[in-house]
UniProtKB/Swiss-Prot annotation:
It is an enzyme of class 2 (transferase). It is found in: Cytoplasm. This is Holo-[acyl-carrier-protein] synthase. Its EC number is 2.7.8.7. One of its GO terms (cellular component) is cytoplasm. It comes from Corynebacterium glutamicum (strain ATCC 13032 / DSM 20300 / JCM 1318 / BCRC 11384 / CCUG 27702 / LMG 3730 / NBRC 12168 / NCIMB 10025 / NRRL B-2784 / 534). Its cofactor is Mg(2+). The keyword Heme does not apply.
Length: 135
């Protein structure tokens, strides 16, 4: 079985959210994701993180689709977003890496799975698609 999730993020609105005084939104990103974003030019910082946010959302949507007709395994407000980490290899190809606890919960709900991820940016938008292949 294959399950697909896609998310679209408006980069300008996302940047405003990041810049709000007292915002804790950066906490949704892992230390590694924040470090990689800080390596970008200031003008591309929000763009980079918007793509990562879209990727995290696309994973949740793909997982949710995989359990269609069943109640959610984790309430939306209980998701620990930094447990869904977007990593890139030396050539910039991205992948989802789940914290061990979350990976166990996902496996318990859908069985063994693998994921594929794509992130793209165009103008003021970032989009990500996650495909879960369930064995």
């Amino acid at each position: 079985m294959i399950s697909i999730g896609t998310d679209l993020v408006h980069i300008s609105a996302f940047a405003e959210q990041l810049a709000q005084p007292g915002s804790s939104f950066m906490e949704v990103f892992s230390a590694g994701e924040r470090r990689k974003a800080n390596e970008r030019q200031a003008s591309r910082y929000a763009e980079h993180l918007a793509g990562r946010w879209a990727a995290k959302e696309s994973f949740i949507k793909a997982w949710s689709q995989a359990i269609y007709g069943q109640p959610p395994v984790i309430a939306e407000e209980a998701v620990v977003w930094r447990d869904i980490e977007v990593r890139a290899d030396a050539w910039g190809r991205v992948a989802i890496e789940l914290a061990p606890e979350l990976a166990a919960v996902v496996r318990e709900s859908i069985g063994e799975f693998s994921s594929s991820l794509s992130i793209s940016h165009d103008g003021d938008y970032a989009v990500a698609t996650c495909v879960l292949t369930i064995q």
